[in-house]
């Protein structure tokens, strides 16, 4: 079992360092605000004219352009989108790093697949909260924390491990627990989870279930409720207590169908394709494809985004959400669309 580091295991070295947070999106705003509220000295690095600049200032944070921010800092956390990181790092970050600095990333993609090259005299680390930034921030404000992974890619100073862990503590993650990993393991498992299960696999499963019912003549609205809308109820149960809690909470009929039908959906053919997806990630094939797609302007990516947005499941979902919102706004005792009884 991996060791879990908690607040009592970790020092406060990060509070003695000047920290640059590059980016002020979902993760950037949470890291910067949590660090500040933990007593750290933080500057947000952005490009001049960024829409996030006034937002960061309104939050009470110091903001400067990226080169200036990096020169000022001793610890630099890169929180720009993956596809924007390589040119920004090459042109604005790397030339301004000093010997003994700590360069941090929240995802290992660009380091693991050699899209950025951190100078050898600079420490290299990873702190990856396992959830979106707005949740990281809200948990911190509630006195709670979000689990995170950490890794040390290079320890040029002999102090990198303690400082990386201290950063994780500063953003509140040690309240929940911090697990050690490597850049390779974090990157490959994260990409696989996104592609085969959480995003790619799940999206395809939801659409396939919806389409199967609609093609069989069932109402699209019922197909949406059964195959998409109720997913949150199931996921919440799994989050609370695993698959066992979910199976305990559903009917015996649903549980029996889980055991008998599930293996028909996820059969050996699906498992083999999942192994192929993992192999493409491990070999760097997916990374190369994604890098080339961005270098070409992302036209294929944007076309897929537009096509998926036009799927019937999106239109039906939007209609049902609007109907639910209308019902929620109706006065008590006066059902929307009907007479008061």
From Swiss-Prot:
Pfam families assigned to the protein according to its UniProt record, in alphabetical order: KARI_C, KARI_N
GO biological process: isoleucine biosynthetic process; L-valine biosynthetic process
Molecular function, one GO term: NADP binding
Cofactor dependence: Mg(2+)
Disulfide bonds: none
Cofactor note: Binds 2 magnesium ions per subunit.
Top enzyme category: oxidoreductase
Domain named KARI N-terminal Rossmann: residues: 1-181
EC number: 1.1.1.86
Domain KARI C-terminal knotted: 182-327
GO cellular component terms listed in the entry, alphabetical order: cytosol
Binding of Mg(2+) 2, residues: 190, 226, 230
Active-site residue numbers: 107
Binding positions (NADP(+)): 24-27, 50, 52, 82-85, 133
Similarity comment: family membership: Belongs to the ketol-acid reductoisomerase family.
Protein function: Involved in the biosynthesis of branched-chain amino acids (BCAA). Catalyzes an alkyl-migration followed by a ketol-acid reduction of (S)-2-acetolactate (S2AL) to yield (R)-2,3-dihydroxy-isovalerate. In the isomerase reaction, S2AL is rearranged via a Mg-dependent methyl migration to produce 3-hydroxy-3-methyl-2-ketobutyrate (HMKB). In the reductase reaction, this 2-ketoacid undergoes a metal-dependent reduction by NADPH to yield (R)-2,3-dihydroxy-isovalerate.
Name by which UniProt lists this protein: Ketol-acid reductoisomerase (NADP(+))
Annotated organism of origin: Rubrobacter xylanophilus (strain DSM 9941 / JCM 11954 / NBRC 16129 / PRD-1)
Gene: ilvC
């Amino acid at each position: 079992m991996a060791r879990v580091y908690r607040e009592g295991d970790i020092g406060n070295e990060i509070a003695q360092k000047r920290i640059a947070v590059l980016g002020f999106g979902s993760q950037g705003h949470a890291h910067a605000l949590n660090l500040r509220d933990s007593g750290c000295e933080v500057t947000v690095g952005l490009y001049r004219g960024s829409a996030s600049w006034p937002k960061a200032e309104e939050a009470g944070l110091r903001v400067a352009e990226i080169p200036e921010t990096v020169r000022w800092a001793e610890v630099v956390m890169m929180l720009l989108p993956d596809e924007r990181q390589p040119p920004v790092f090459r042109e604005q970050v790397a030339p301004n790093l000093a010997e003994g600095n700590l360069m941090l990333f929240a995802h290992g993609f660009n380091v693991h697949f050699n899209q950025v090259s951190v100078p050898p005299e600079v420490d290299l680390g990873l702190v990856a909260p396992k959830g979106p930034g707005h949740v990281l921030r809200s948990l911190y404000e509630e006195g709670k924390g979000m689990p995170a992974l950490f890794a040390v890619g290079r320890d040029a100073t002999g102090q990198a491990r303690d400082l990386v862990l201290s950063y994780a503590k500063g953003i509140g993650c040690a309240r929940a627990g911090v697990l050690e990993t490597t850049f390779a393991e974090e990157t490959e498992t994260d990409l696989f989870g996104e592609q085969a299960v959480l995003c790619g696999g799940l999206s395809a499963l939801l659409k396939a279930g919806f389409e199967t019912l609609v093609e069989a003549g069932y109402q699209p609205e019922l197909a949406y409720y059964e195959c998409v809308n109720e997913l949150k109820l199931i996921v919440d149960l799994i989050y609370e207590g695993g698959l066992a809690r979910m199976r305990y909470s559903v009917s015996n009929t649903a549980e029996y169908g889980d055991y008998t039908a599930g293996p028909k959906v996820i059969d050996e053919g699906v498992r083999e394709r999942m192994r192929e997806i993992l192999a493409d990630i491990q070999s760097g094939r997916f990374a190369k494809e994604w890098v080339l797609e961005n270098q070409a302007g992302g036209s294929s990516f944007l076309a897929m985004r537009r096509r998926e947005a036009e799927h019937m499941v999106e239109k039906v979902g939007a209609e049902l959400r609007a109907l639910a919102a209308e019902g929620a706004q109706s006065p008590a005792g006066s059902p929307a669309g009907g007479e008061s009884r």
